[in-house]
Swiss-Prot record:
The chain crosses the membrane at residues 8-28. It is a single-pass membrane protein. Belongs to the ATPase B chain family. It comes from the Bacteria. This is ATP synthase subunit b.
């Protein structure tokens, strides 16, 4: 440091200072504007990139919100379809049960009617056979008892007596 102070030359200092000032003026005149434009352009590029990133982020959030909304709607629609399918299944089961009960009841009523009809027919047939059999027995008994003249006259007199009483 002492050597620099001892070897100091004012002329050299002047020329170096003058060259530095001229260099600075030339830089300001010719290079400062392009450097500043480059820095400004770089700042604008960074600012635009940040804005684009922010816009992309917002758009991504909107897309995610839309995706979530669409997913929720799809789930709600699926749940509604499942609920409707369950209701249809339950309705079909209930309808089938009702139809089966009605068919069973109808068959029971038809069977009862058929049984009643068969019973009435059997009773009529039985009555017919009993009356035929009774007539046959009565005819045989009457033939047996009325085989002689005396019993025939007694019967006729008795019947005439009954008719007078009535």
């Amino acid at each position: 440091m002492d050597k620099l102070i001892n070897d100091f030359s004012f002329g050299l200092f002047f020329w170096q200072a003058l060259i530095l000032v001229i260099l600075i003026l030339l830089l300001v005149k010719f290079a400062w504007k392009p450097i500043m434009e480059s820095i400004t352009a770089r700042e604008e590029g960074i600012k635009n990139a940040l804005l684009s990133a922010e816009n992309a982020k917002r758009e991504m959030e909107n897309l995610q919100a839309d995706n979530q909304r669409i997913l929720n709607e799809a789930r709600a629609e699926r749940d509604a379809m499942l609920k409707e399918a369950r209701e249809m299944k339950e309705k079909m089961i209930a309808d089938s049960k009702n139809e089966a009960q009605e068919a069973g009841q109808k068959m029971i009523e038809q069977a009862k009617a058929a049984i009643e009809s068969e019973k009435n027919a059997a009773m009529a047939e039985l009555k017919s056979q009993v009356s035929t059999l009774s007539l046959s027995i009565a005819e045989k008994l009457l033939k047996e008892e009325l085989s002689n003249k005396e019993s025939q006259t007694k019967l006729v007199e008795k019947m005439l007596g009954d008719v007078k009483l009535n």
